[in-house]
Design a protein with these regions (language model features):
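Helix N-cap at the start of a conserved alpha-helix in ABC-type nucleotide-binding domains
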Residues: 89-91
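Catalytic Walker B motif of ABC-type/P-loop ATPase nucleotide-binding domains
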Residues: 78-81
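Conserved ABC ATPase "signature" region
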Residues: 31-49
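Hydrophobic anchor residue at the start of the ABC signature
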Residues: 67
Length: 180
């Protein structure tokens, strides 16, 4: 799980230690941990911060550290709360591209997001909640008209096989302070 606020999950002294924490806790050998840390530092352009305390970084960099620390564990299911919040456009696009590649490799992705552009680009299904209740669920309608309206999804259709739910989006439509 990647929290929306990176300060809720970062607790190590340096960026490098933060990224290494998960793989180390999984019992991976040092060489594998080092490789994964290096991959994440490169992916998020964090090498210049590897020996710096994440607490001293800007919000976008702390988000990148939090995201990379979870990605380094290579979990089979990844839950992301507003994954691109606070990231500049370039870093957000890079991160979402990485998420898409992980999904293509079989990682189940659950995104909680208000960013409908990301929804239409990266998700196959939407589960929309309003006041804690499901108001709609189904495959995403990728037509241009539908993308202009956040409440439009395709009606379920018959197919030759089951609909893949490897990429699900939870879209919260009403936010109450302190509750998601």
């Amino acid at each position: 799980f990647v929290f929306q606020n990176p300060d809720h999950q970062i607790f190590c002294s340096t960026t490098k230690e933060e990224i290494a924490f998960g793989p180390t806790a999984l019992g991976l050998d040092g060489a594998t941990v080092f490789k994964r840390v290096d991959e994440m530092l490169t992916l998020f352009d964090l090498h210049r911060y590897e020996d710096v305390s994440p607490a001293t970084l800007g919000y976008g960099e702390r988000r990148a550290v939090a995201l990379s620390s979870v990605l380094a564990m290579r979990t089979p299911i990844l839950v992301l709360d507003e994954p691109t919040a606070g990231l500049d456009h370039r870093l957000a696009a890079r991160f979402l591209g990485t998420i898409e590649k992980l999904n293509q490799r079989g990682v189940t992705i659950v995104m909680i997001s208000h960013d409908m552009r990301a929804v239409y680009r990266y998700c196959t299904h939407v589960l929309e909640l309003e006041d804690g209740k499901v108001v709609q669920y189904g495959p995403i309608d990728r037509s241009e008209a539908a993308q202009k309206q956040s409440r439009t999804i395709r009606k379920p259709r018959k197919s030759n096989g089951p609909v893949s739910a490897t990429h699900v989006l939870l879209k919260v439509t009403k936010h109450e302070e302190g509750r998601h």
